Amino acid sequence: MTEVYDLEITTNATDFPMEKKYPAGMSLNDLKKKLELVVGTTVDSMRIQLFDGDDQLKGELTDGAKSLKDLGVRDGYRIHAVDVTGGNEDFKDESMVEKYEMSDDTYGKRTDSVRAWKKKMQEEQGSAAPMENESDKLNEEAAKNIMVGNRCEVTVGAQMARRGEVAYVGATKFKEGVWVGVKYDEPVGKNDGSVAGVRYFDCDPKYGGFVRPVDVKVGDFPELSIDEI
């Protein structure tokens, strides 16, 4: 039987950790490829740090050809992926005033920004996924094609695609607009179907999440096998 590790994945691209399963024999380079959409950068611009079960830094993983097991990764460890270009920090550090005051036209011309990376990925993949600043009208139109019980795949920004089942579609009390509640196949969500004391659907903790309709694709999206995760 293939040895599989349960790992916590964190990144400087998001404040929310994810729990993923990876084969012990997977190479570091293959892991980086899996994390490209999560970190928002390419394999060559990614650093990987390893933390043990007590969250103590073990070191940086650099040999891309070696397996996770050979590099000292073990079940329950944490993998922290870092974009060395610092591009995705534009969205996290509120003290970086220059980033927020930069004109949209100037930012759009940058080739090292997260926006440029996402545009490149969309062109390569032929994706029609809307960008982050789509109007409420687009969300309302997208919601018309989403029904409770649909299998779906969720892609928010540069994060890794997540699969699950649509559990709620409609307005919420926590924020205006149309939202889709998703019951994920894995514990990659933020809640149990409730937000601020209001329950919208039922699921286990960390298996639920709410996203905008434009970030949801419905269709034949079965649960991923270990090799596909």
From Swiss-Prot:
A Pfam family that the UniProt record links to this protein: CAP_GLY
Description of how the protein assembles with itself and partners: Supercomplex made of cofactors A to E. Cofactors A and D function by capturing and stabilizing tubulin in a quasi-native conformation. Cofactor E binds to the cofactor D-tubulin complex; interaction with cofactor C then causes the release of tubulin polypeptides that are committed to the native state.
Predominant localisation class: cytoplasm
Family per record: Belongs to the TBCB family.
Organism, as annotated: Caenorhabditis elegans
CDD domains: Ubl_TBCB
GO biological process entries: post-chaperonin tubulin folding pathway; tubulin complex assembly
Domain CAP-Gly as annotated: residue spans: 170-212
Keyword Ribosomal protein: no
Annotated protein name in UniProt: Tubulin-specific chaperone B
Gene symbol of the encoding locus: tbcb-1
